[in-house]
Amino acid sequence: MNNNILEIIIPIYNEGPKVLKLMELFKKNIKINFKILFCYDDVTDNIFDYQDELKKFDFDIEFIKNPSQGPCSAIKEGFSVGVSDCVIVYPCDDLINVELINEMYNLFLNGKHIVAASRFMKGGSMKGCPLIKSILVRSASFTLYHLSSIPIKDASNGFRLFSRKL
């Protein structure tokens, strides 16, 4: 295992323009060594139209073909290909929370094996979220937290850090 680098799995589906914005934020905010694993469904994905622009960031980037389709399968493939002791799953459309990556990694270094970002903690928010979606997300998360053994208060948020020790 490579324990001195963070791998960031980003499931993508025709996210080209968003990826460039996200990479700008990564460059500005992430203060630790990291590698990006872009997990895509199909070779026609528009991410490949942006490869030259991505090279300008000088990041360690690997493109991983999803053997199936959808974000769940893409994340699983990212985990199977990755080698780091610490992996973050980051939603490509989250242009707000990049700075939390450093904090989450520090929690990992201090012994945490799972770190889940939450929109329901102090300082968290669901900016721009339609009311009905907000109600559904909050209700589902509340129910899962109280009726299951999962100690996560924001079950539908895809932004998480995992230790390979699990």
Can you annotate each of these PLM segments?
Residues 40-49, 94:
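A conserved acidic beta->alpha catalytic loop
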Residues 15-18, 43, 71, 97:
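Donor nucleotide-sugar binding loop of glycosyltransferases
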Residues 5-7, 35:
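Cell-envelope/extracellular polymer assembly enzymes that use nucleotide-activated donors
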Residues 15-28:
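Short, well-formed alpha-helical segments that are part of the catalytic scaffolds
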